[in-house]
UniProtKB/Swiss-Prot annotation:
Taxonomic source organism: Pseudomonas putida (strain GB-1)
Pathway info: Amino-acid biosynthesis; L-arginine biosynthesis; L-arginine from L-ornithine and carbamoyl phosphate: step 3/3
Name by which UniProt lists this protein: Argininosuccinate lyase
Cellular component GO terms held in the UniProt record: cytosol
Keywords, alphabetical: Amino-acid biosynthesis, Arginine biosynthesis, Cytoplasm, Lyase
SUPFAM superfamilies: L-aspartase-like
Subcellular location: Cytoplasm
Species classification: Bacteria, Pseudomonadati, Pseudomonadota, Gammaproteobacteria, Pseudomonadales
Length: 464
């Protein structure tokens, strides 16, 4: 007869219940219950394996699996009573299973510890989350390709130091973000490979004395391989850290993109218009249309950076193997995944709806001597050393600043006062179209190269 006075699965060696505050303080069920589906998935695979090796009978296996599926239905219908006194998602489900099917439910945990159970749950969950995030990246990239194809010839100023630098096409600019997101996609795919290793069977830390078949469980759960060391399997969270690192880079890219969208929608730039459905107003200023979506994505980036820092700090001082510290791995991981997925979704919805203001973009590109490098290159082709050409054009720009004229607005005589190598054909070089069309190589801003990059991008997405 049980003498457990603690209402806990581990209460046999204790003589008094856990303090009520400590029970609440140490419980994780309020946040780890979102792992219920993966916990049940792992338990079904574990029960199947136990029956295969003779630890459970086929009838016991079937009873357990039916009970677990019923419990999943209760949870998804909102009819499950989550209890803090049962600590976590694992014990809540196991206790409910025992309530439903009796003593057979107590056999499910044979050859298993919550240490390898939770490590398995998190990996299963993260694997699914990465798949959802990858789908959102692809959707955003599709939107970028559509916009880039439409705007292959739309000219805008390119910037360095947020100062006008050279003319570029809007399509080319958008494709820069496509390239960054492609690397984000690759990082997450690579991260998924290392997350897709199965700790189940590691038990508490040293493995189990039961004749388990880890390869069978691995196959049932769709893992690529089993964890090769039981201590490592239960104790490390480097896969979660790696995910948060990849998520941080992706959010950094979205944050930079957000900053551009905020600038471009401002009265000072007016390069684009965001549809009203992605903006909000002011409670006091009737005229305001605020770009809240990109602003909020920019702000949320700090949460993901914080998750990465938090997980690194969490793990840095832990000896092998499992420690209670690891309970703190879930909330930052969950938040990082939620934030990245939601931010990508917002961008994937918003980017195809952006409306560029072509005339304003072009007018801005005509300011700031954006074709100065083209004039220097023109002189190089006339046989002058580049550094001399740089100096010559610098004097021409200074003259333009003093007279209020762009290079293309100067007469031939005005330009020739800086070099007698300048001829009438220079004006074809100094046009915006001449500037962008001249950069007609892979990775360049010429419209032909933008269209070629779009074709490559579509092929990349089709190959996923």
């Amino acid at each position: 007869m049980s003498t457990d006075k603690t209402n806990q699965s581990w209460g046999g060696r204790f003589s008094e219940p856990v303090d009520a505050f400590v029970a609440r303080f140490t419980a994780s069920v309020d946040f780890d219950k979102r792992l219920y589906r993966h916990d049940i998935m792992g338990s079904i695979a574990h029960a199947t394996m136990l029956a295969q090796v003779g630890v459970l009978s086929d009838a016991e296996r079937d009873t357990i699996i039916d009970g677990l599926k019923t419990i999943q239905g209760e949870i998804e219908a909102g009819n499950f009573d989550w209890r803090v006194d049962l600590e976590d998602v694992h014990m809540n489900i196991e206790a409910r299973l025992t309530d439903r099917i009796g003593i057979t439910g107590k056999k499910l945990h044979t050859g298993r510890s919550r240490n390898d159970q939770v490590a398995t749950d998190i990996r299963l969950w993260l694997r699914d989350e990465i798949d959802l995030i990858l789908a959102e990246i692809t959707r955003l990239q599709q939107g970028l390709l559509e916009q880039a194809e439409r705007e292959a010839e739309t000219i805008m100023p390119g910037f360095t130091h947020l100062q006008t630098a050279q003319p570029v096409t809007f399509g080319h600019h958008l494709l820069a973000w496509f390239e960054m997101l492609s690397r984000d996609y690759e990082r997450l795919v690579d991260c998924r490979k290392r997350a897709n290793r199965m700790p189940l069977g590691s038990a508490a830390l040293a493995g189990t004395t039961y004749p388990i078949d880890r390869e069978l469980t691995c196959k049932l759960l769709g893992f690529e391989a089993v964890a090769g060391n039981s201590l490592d399997g239960v104790s490390d969270r480097d896969f979660a850290i790696e995910f948060c690192a990849a998520a941080s880079v992706a959010m950094m890219h979205l944050s930079r993109f957000s900053e551009e969208l905020v600038l471009w929608t401002s009265a000072q730039f007016q390069f684009i218009d965001l549809p009203d459905r992605f903006c909000t107003g002011s409670s006091i200023m009737p005229q305001k249309k605020n770009p809240d979506v990109p602003e909020l994505v920019r702000g949320k980036t700090g949460r993901v950076f914080g998750a990465l820092t938090g997980l690194l700090t969490l793990m840095k001082g832990q000896p092998l193997a499992y420690n209670k510290d690891n309970q703190e791995d879930k909330e930052p991981l969950f938040d990082a995944a939620d934030t990245l997925r939601d931010s990508l979704r917002a961008f994937a919805d918003m980017i195809p709806a952006i409306k560029p203001k072509h005339a304003i973009m072009r007018e801005a590109a005509l300011r700031g001597f954006s074709t100065a490098t083209d004039l220097a290159d023109y002189l190089v082709r006339r046989g002058l050393p580049f550094r001399d050409c740089h100096e010559i054009v610098g004097h021409a720009v200074k003259y333009g600043v003093d007279t209020g004229k762009d290079l293309a607005e100067m007469s031939l005589d005005e330009l020739r006062q800086f070099s007698d190598q300048i001829e009438q054909d220079v004006f074809a070089v100094l046009t915006l179209e001449g500037s962008v069309n001249a950069r007609n190589h892979i990775g360049g801003t010429a419209p032909a190269q933008v269209r070629a990059a779009v074709v490559r991008g579509k092929a990349l997405l089709a190959s996923r």
